[in-house]
């Protein structure tokens, strides 16, 4: 995130300390399926990786999300976005997330961990009644199988570890050596073939709609 959009200088030192303390606690003891990515130079730019929950169309995907703290935080809620493309009723085309916790149900004592857990829960139980993506909301209510297939397809295309530049949330980082690059090349070929196949399936599915 560019420093020109940073609100660090607008936050109180107490708020900055509280946010950093919570992020460091989450880094040491991460919630299940969530990994925070700390930007020590700008605590208003918070990113995390969320594992797609098992039993949902998002399973096996890894989703990068972003929280942006404004100058009135924690009196006002942060903005939340999916940086990974996702087909979900409560996620707009620009990635903005609609959830009551970040709107009418916001309380200043709700922390970053609570927000990230709420976003993960949204992957398990979408709320089509307050949809930002009306197509996804309508499809979920009226043709769930089609919704599930579309969401799963988007997950397979956009939410794989290679797309996020990371391994699974629990994986160790590689050292970027020759062996890693060799495997990356093979993985890319396999992913390209898989993507081509998925796009063909998507076209067939869209023709049936």
UniProtKB/Swiss-Prot annotation:
Q: In which pathway does it act?
A: Protein modification; protein ubiquitination
User: Region annotation Disordered: residue ranges?
Assistant: 168-194
Name the catalysed reactions: S-ubiquitinyl-[E1 ubiquitin-activating enzyme]-L-cysteine + [E2 ubiquitin-conjugating enzyme]-L-cysteine = [E1 ubiquitin-activating enzyme]-L-cysteine + S-ubiquitinyl-[E2 ubiquitin-conjugating enzyme]-L-cysteine
Q: Where is the UBC core domain?
A: 14-160
Identify the keywords attached in UniProt to this record, alphabetized: ATP-binding, Cell cycle, Cell division, Nucleotide-binding, Transferase, Ubl conjugation pathway
Give a short account of what the protein does. Catalyzes the covalent attachment of ubiquitin to other proteins. Acts as an essential factor of the anaphase promoting complex/cyclosome (APC/C), a cell cycle-regulated ubiquitin ligase that controls progression through mitosis. Acts by specifically elongating polyubiquitin chains initiated by the E2 enzyme vih/UbcH10 on APC/C substrates, enhancing the degradation of APC/C substrates by the proteasome and promoting mitotic exit.
Matches recorded under SUPFAM superfamilies? UBC-like (SSF54495)
* Pfam families to which the protein is assigned, alphabetical: UQ_con
Give the family, as the similarity comment puts it: Belongs to the ubiquitin-conjugating enzyme family.
Q: Name one GO biological process term.
A: exit from mitosis
Q: Which organism is it from?
A: Drosophila melanogaster (Fruit fly)
Q: What is this protein called?
A: Ubiquitin-conjugating enzyme E2 S
Enzyme's top EC category: transferase
Active-site annotation: 98 (glycyl thioester intermediate)
């Amino acid at each position: 995130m560019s420093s020109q959009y940073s609100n660090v200088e607008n936050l109180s030192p107490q708020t900055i300390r509280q946010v950093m303390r919570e992020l460091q606690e989450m880094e040491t003891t991460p919630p299940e399926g969530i990994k925070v990515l700390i930007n020590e130079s700008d605590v208003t730019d918070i990113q995390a990786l969320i594992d797609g929950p098992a039993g949902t169309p998002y399973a096996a995907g890894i989703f990068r999300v972003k929280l942006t703290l404004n100058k009135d935080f924690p009196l006002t809620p942060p903005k939340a976005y999916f940086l990974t493309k996702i087909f979900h009723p409560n996620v707009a085309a620009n990635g903005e997330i609609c959830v009551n916790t970040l709107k009418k149900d916001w309380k200043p004592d709700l922390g970053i961990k609570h927000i990230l857990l709420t976003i993960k829960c949204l992957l398990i139980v979408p709320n089509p009644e307050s949809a930002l993506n009306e197509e996804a909301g309508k499809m979920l209510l009226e043709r769930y199988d089609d919704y599930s297939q579309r969401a799963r397809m988007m997950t397979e295309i956009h939410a794989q570890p290679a797309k996020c530049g990371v391994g699974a949330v629990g994986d160790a980082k590689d050292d970027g050596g020759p062996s890693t690059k060799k495997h990356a090349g093979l993985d890319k070929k396999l992913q390209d073939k898989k993507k081509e196949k998925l796009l063909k399936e998507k076209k067939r599915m869209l023709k049936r709609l």
